[in-house]
C-alpha cells in the first residue's frame, strides 16, 4: 500500500494519555539494551528526537548514570507527561526536556555524541527533516540509533498487527497505531532517504513491525 500521512501529531490530551499508559516496555527496553550493547562507551551527551512520555530516556538514564540526555517533543501534552515521569524518577539533573519541533528547536550544530529516536520518523510528512537535523546536530562520528515502524504491505496486514500487539489497549490507541503503521516508511524507502542525505547508516528489520537504523556519522 502507499503511505498515508497521519492527520496530526499527538497533541490531544486523550491521545497522549492513552499512549503514555500503553505498555511499550518490551520494545523500549529492547531499544535501550541494544543501544548500550552496540555502543557501550559512546553515550555521553545524547539527544532523543520525539521523546514522547520519556520512557526510553528514563530507562537509558537508569542504565547509564553518567549520560546527559536532551529529550525533545513537539506535543505539549506529551512533554507535560514526560516532565511528570522524569520528576517521579528523580532524574531532572540527567534529563532536560524541551518542547519544540524540528527544525526549529534551538540546538547548536555538532553538539551531541549520540542521536536517538524511537517511533518518531513516521510522524513526519517529510522524512528528510529528520535526516538533515541528524547531520546538523551530531558531532563527527556521532552514534545514530533510530527505531521506527515499517509499513505493512496492505491495510489488512496493518489491522492484524494492531490486533496482535494492542488487542487490550484503548480504542483511541488502536486507531493511532493503525494510522502510524499506514504512515510508516518501508526499509527500502528509508535506505533511499539515507542515500539522499549522505548518511552512512544501515537499515534492518528487527521485528514484524520495527526496523532499526543505526551507525555513525562521518568522522
PLM region spans:
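Class I SAM-dependent methyltransferase SAM/SAH-binding core
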Residues: 47, 55-104
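Conserved alpha-helix/loop element of class I SAM-dependent methyltransferases that forms part
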Residues: 25-44
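Conserved glycine-rich SAM-binding loop
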Residues: 52
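A conserved beta-strand element that flanks and buttresses the S-adenosyl-L-methionine
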Residues: 116
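C-terminal alpha-helical "lid/dimerization" subdomain adjacent to the S-adenosyl-L-methionine
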Residues: 149-198, 203-205
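Conserved beta-strand signature within the Rossmann-like core of class I S-adenosyl-L-methionine
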Residues: 141-148
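A short glycine-rich, Lys/Arg-flanked "PGG" loop and its adjoining helix->strand segment in the class I
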Residues: 129-140
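N-terminal, positively charged/glycine-rich alpha-helical extensions of SAM-dependent methyltransferases
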Residues: 1-18
Amino acid at each position: 500500500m502507499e503511505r498515508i500521512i497521519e492527520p496530526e501529531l499527538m497533541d490531544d490530551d486523550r491521545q497522549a494519555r492513552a499512549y503514555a499508559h500503553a505498555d511499550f516496555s518490551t520494545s523500549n527496553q529492547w531499544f535501550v539494551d541494544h543501544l548500550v550493547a552496540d555502543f557501550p562507551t559512546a553515550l555521553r551527551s545524547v539527544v532523543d528526537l520525539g521523546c514522547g512520555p520519556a520512557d526510553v530516556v528514563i530507562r537509558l538514564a537508569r542504565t547509564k548514570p553518567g549520560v546527559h540526555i536532551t529529550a525533545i517533543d513537539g506535543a505539549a501534552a506529551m512533554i507535560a507527561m514526560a516532565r511528570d515521569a522524569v520528576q517521579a524518577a528523580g532524574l531532572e539533573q540527567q534529563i532536560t526536556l524541551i518542547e519544540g519541533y524540528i527544525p526549529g528547536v534551538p540546538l547548536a550544530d555538532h553538539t551531541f555524541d549520540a542521536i536517538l529516536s524511537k517511533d518518531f520518523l513516521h510522524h513526519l510528512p517529510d522524512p528528510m527533516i529528520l535526516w538533515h537535523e541528524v547531520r546538523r546536530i551530531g558531532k563527527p562520528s556521532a552514534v545514530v540509533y533510530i527505531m521506527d515502524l515499517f509499513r505493512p504491505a496492505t491495510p489488512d496486514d496493518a489491522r492484524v498487527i494492531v490486533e496482535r500487539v494492542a488487542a487490550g489497549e484503548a480504542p483511541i490507541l488502536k486507531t493511532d497505531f493503525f494510522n502510524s503503521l499506514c504512515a510508516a516508511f518501508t526499509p527500502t524507502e528509508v535506505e533511499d532517504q539515507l542515500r539522499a542525505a549522505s548518511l552512512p547508516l544501515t537499515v534492518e528489520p528487527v521485528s514484524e513491525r520495527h526496523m532499526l537504523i543505526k551507525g555513525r556519522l562521518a568522522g
